[in-house]
Amino acid sequence: MKKSIIAAAFALLFGAQGASAIGIFDNLCYQARLGYNIGGTMPMGMPASIRGLNSYTPKPSFTIALDAYKPLTEKWGMMAGFHFQTKAMETDARVKSYSMEMRQGSESLSGLFTGNVVTNAKQLVVTLPLQATFSVSDAVRLKFGPYFSYALNNEFTGYAYDGYLREGDPTGTRIELGNTPDSWGTYDFSDQMRHLQLGVNLGADWQFHHRWGVYADLAWGVTGVHRSSFHTIEQTLYPIFGTVGVIYRLK
């Protein structure tokens, strides 16, 4: 193990020296970012089993980031960074014949639920974006590219209430769920969420001062938040979040 770590350290060292020799680290501009995220995990299109949204509540979600920008030509460049992010939301939806697994008291239930479902989703992720940039002017820069995220912590919990569950299939035993905590059907699918996530990011930076600027980004996941082997929720849910925040130029 120790030999592997030493070998990796030497590889990084010589790799960095080689990159420096060809000028990759020349003329770099470093930026710190603080942003607020708003969005959620959602399907592409509204499935027939989801009849409407009673409420959507964004939860406090933030980005703390360090980016490095490298100009390649007068207009074009590239940007990479290290982003530490929280992404959270709560929804309350009306559903009909919605595939679910839940617990009511000590009993495990599965089948098709008609009623209301509350979902709380939260992730703590480290994101590595790699973007091409285009400078519209000295102050405004557009950017687009892929990102890679690793979830340090996943939460996907909630409860079904004020409805009924048909066990197994649409003709199964009908089980009533009320609107008080002891009559809800609760669920926790946190252990079925992916750790590695991929997506695309686009946005714009406006540097209105030598040091200070503002930015807006949109991150769209192309992998679902749950593992491919998870089929309790019929539709694939994707993380889609927008971010607005401030930039401070370090160099």
Go through each PLM region and give its residues.
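Transmembrane beta-barrel domains of outer membrane proteins
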Residues: 65-69, 131-133, 205-207, 215, ...
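Transmembrane beta-barrel strands of outer-membrane/channel proteins
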Residues: 32-38, 80-86, 144-150, 216-220, ...
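Cleavable N-terminal export/targeting peptides
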Residues: 1-27, 251
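Short glycine/proline- and aromatic-enriched beta-strand/turn motifs that initiate or cap beta-hairpins
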Residues: 21-71, 140, 149, 193, ...
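Outer-membrane beta-barrel "beta-signal"
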Residues: 206-210, 238-251
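Repeated loop/turn-to-beta-strand initiation elements of outer-membrane beta-barrel proteins
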Residues: 75-78, 139-142, 210-216
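Extracellular/periplasm-exposed beta-strand and loop segments of Gram-negative cell-envelope proteins
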Residues: 40-59, 87-123, 151-197, 201, ...
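Membrane-embedded beta-strand positions in outer-membrane beta-barrel channels/transporters
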Residues: 31, 61-65, 125-129, 201, ...
